[in-house]
Design a protein with these regions (language model features):
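Short coil/turn connectors at secondary-structure junctions
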Residues: 1, 38-40, 46, 50, ...
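Histidine-rich, glycine-flanked metal-binding segment
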Residues: 1-53
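Divalent metal-coordination and catalytic microenvironments
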Residues: 8, 26, 47, 58, ...
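Short, glycine/acidic-enriched loop or turn micro-motifs at the edges of active sites
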Residues: 27, 59-61, 152
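Redox-cofactor binding/interface segments in oxidoreductases and associated redox assembly factors
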Residues: 44, 89, 149
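Metal-associated gating/positioning segment near the N- to mid-region
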Residues: 48-113
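Histidine/acidic-residue-rich, glycine-tolerant segments that coordinate divalent metal ions
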Residues: 93-104, 109-154
Length: 154
């Protein structure tokens, strides 16, 4: 789909500037003033600031294990509504993402439910207890954004 955002405000080198953004299939393909871009949808963005997607490196999506508090579907939708396109989900889950098998449970939920890019953390310690045996960080590092025991000192 081709979309044109007209006269939005962008912050450029410390100054606000009015620009048009041409978007094709979700990708910005042109930026400038008074762009000619045949589009299926045109939005008048005067009075609105245009920003790239935001990133939040500390969110609680609560699945698996605590879906009565939040789910990946509801949490990621709320993040998208606020302009966040990428979030990093804390590991205070049940089971804690402390092994390949436990992380796979969370990854399957993310794959099936998230409406934005959700990157999981793995826990530092087994069971996210803040003490005792460490997780196999080398085995998990390629699948997570980092390691945390979220709220528990190690």
């Amino acid at each position: 789909m081709r979309v044109l955002l007209k006269d939005g405000s962008v912050l450029e080198q410390g100054k606000w500037k009015q620009v048009d953004l041409a978007i094709e299939n979700g990708v910005i393909v042109a930026r400038g003033e008074q762009l000619f871009f045949p589009a299926e949808k045109v939005f008048d963005c005067r009075g609105f600031a245009l920003f790239p997607g935001f990133v939040d490196v500390h969110v609680h999506l609560r699945e698996p294990g605590f879906s009565y508090k939040e789910t990946i579907a509801t949490g990621s939708a709320a993040c998208a509504h606020g302009g966040y396109t990428t979030v990093c989900a804390m590991p205070n889950l049940n089971p804690a993402p402390d092994s390949s098998e436990h992380l796979a449970v969370e990854e399957a939920l993310i794959q099936g439910e998230a409406v934005i890019d959700v990157r999981p953390y793995a826990s530092i310690t087994m069971g996210q207890k803040g003490e005792g045996e460490l997780t196999d960080m080398a085995a998990l590092s390629g699948r997570v954004c980092g390691f945390s025991d979220d709220g528990r000192g190690v």
